[in-house]
Amino acid sequence: EMTSSLVGSEMCIRDRSSTVDFVFSAVDMTKDEIKAIEEAYAKTETPVVSNNSAHRWTKDVPMVVPEINAAHFDLIKTQKERLGTTRGFIAVKPNCSIQSYTPALAAWKEFGPKEVVVTTYQAISGAGKTFKDWPEMIENIIPYIGGEEEKSEKEPLRVLGTLENGEIKLAEEPKITCQCLRVPVLNGHTAAVFI
């Protein structure tokens, strides 16, 4: 079914939420629109698992890689109080490029790494493109992806952080420096990580 027919009025959200157990959210909208639609679903008692970046820094929304920070799910209690829900909530996943190396950082955490240098090689699917849509990428590399470096340096610190007093305290170390390149690969990101 076309997603455009699923997105729209508040009535549509109420109607759809009564027919589903939960919602996977991966939409191409502004951050404000995404926040509004995800909260609307949560307020209808429908759990939302989001691929979008809109709620990644909302204080009571857990950004989870379950193998690393399942304790962050406890934030959902605080979020439900804010939303006035018993079942509905929002949880997000981190940026796709950090999922490949954050588990390795977590494994090294006990050794106290001070600095991490990462270079990501990101497929065009990460930009929502195919080679048909973006023929200029065939045999081409883009050496800078706007906004990706900042996300790749900050989001792991939230994932590796600790839950304290109902919010996430960011990990203070390691210091992460990242360079993000777009490469002529359809699917799959790669990261070179130096700890």
Predicted regions and their residues:
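Catalytic helix-loop patch of NAD(P)-dependent Rossmann-fold dehydrogenases
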Residues: 65-111
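Rossmann-like NAD(P)-binding element
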Residues: 14-36
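Single conserved hydrophobic/aromatic residue that forms the stacking wall/gate
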Residues: 2-13
